[in-house]
Amino acid sequence: MLIPRPYQQDAYDAALKHIRTSKDPSIVHASTAAGKSIIVAMLAQTVKQANKRTLILVPNGDLAAQNADKFREIGEKPSIYSASLGHKCVENHAVFATPMSVLNNLDDFGEEYALIIADECQMISENLESSSQKLLTHFRSINKNIRILGLTATPVRFKTKLVSAGSTFKSVCYSITSEQLASQGWTVPYSIGVSDSTYSL
């Protein structure tokens, strides 16, 4: 049985509350090593229990497989849709996919999805003609009430904020930084250089 860390539970709770109360896309900012795949799995499981579908978008096939494995760990069956992995399945309630594989095969995604989770959401372009915006437009045309949740360890895009009035994402519903992870004992604090006691010439 997978037991989430306290901050993972907090992130899940905050994201679920936002999804249930607002149509505005929001972000979970979770630093590297926070275990975002667990948060994703918990959210997708909750949506499945409501007999609805989740599309989880990740940058590459390896991450699709890793996130799908985490979903299996909590006793659920994922689908994977990634050309690089040779898998194009949408039969289960949670589909882990790469954006271009979806965009190139939109006819396979005609069913209504309740939630899109976009990992590494800082990569989503604000250009309305971009592939990412075309993808979001497709799913919004099927379900005008679809919820969109972004996950990122980097809440900026090319030195600009991800969250603003004119951007895709309107808020950050939860945040945990690398400093907070270290102070809570989940990670080792970053250090630069090598101590004199371990370095000699």
Q: Model features per residue range: what roles?
A:
Residues 15, 39-47, 135, 139:
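Hydrophobic residues on the short alpha-helix immediately C-terminal to a glycine-rich phosphate/catalytic loop
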Residues 71-107:
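Inter-Walker segment of RecA-like/P-loop motor cores
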Residues 94-120, 124-135:
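Conserved RecA-like ASCE ATPase "motif II neighborhood" in helicase/translocase motors
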